Amino acid sequence: MSGARLGLLHTVPALAVTFDDLLKRTGHDGDIVHVVDAGLLSGAIAHGVDDEIRAEVLRHVQHLADDGADAILVTCSSIGEAVEEAAGRVDVPVLRVDATMADEAVALAVERAPADRAARVAVLATLAATLGPTGRLLESRVAGADRPVEVASRVVDGAAAARSGGDQATHDRLVGEAITAAAADADVIVLAQASMAAAAAGLDLDVPVLTSPEGGAAALLAAVRKLPA
């Protein structure tokens, strides 16, 4: 669908620029509408994804749909399950940013792992609130795999505090160190939050490191291509 209007919901303000640039580099020639609500993430951290957050996610998604979005991407993994619930209540495609990454992680781990052990996926996050939603998403994909897959999760201590304090360099260093350590045992490494993606740049590892922005953007564009002209 040429010239499609894309809607994106973020909980980290900087990701609006990240995804805008990413989508424009693909040659997307339609409007891109961004909504930012940092309170969704702070609420999820404080008390989980409760009914209030679910209602707010639905409100934002409905607003984007009413504003003419042909497809919607929510770029926060911590609220992914609320996104799936909202998707069933609007008339346009609504995608969670980490779904494509989860599919790829399990497929790559199964492909790369030696035959004498289970495939291993390492999940890194800077926020504990993200590990539950991402872990459950991965486990749902693991259930369909044709061999055992182990998922190990870890929070990168200090990285979130550094980022919230404006110290992106320390955030990236801590995440980079955690990626390097995880590569010793994992067949695939998953960075659970889109805000972690920059920390993987420049690392020279034999293990694939998957981030959600590219996969999420590709899935969004694929969704609009399937829409009638």
Predicted regions and their residues:
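Non-catalytic structural scaffold of enzyme domains
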Residues: M1-A229
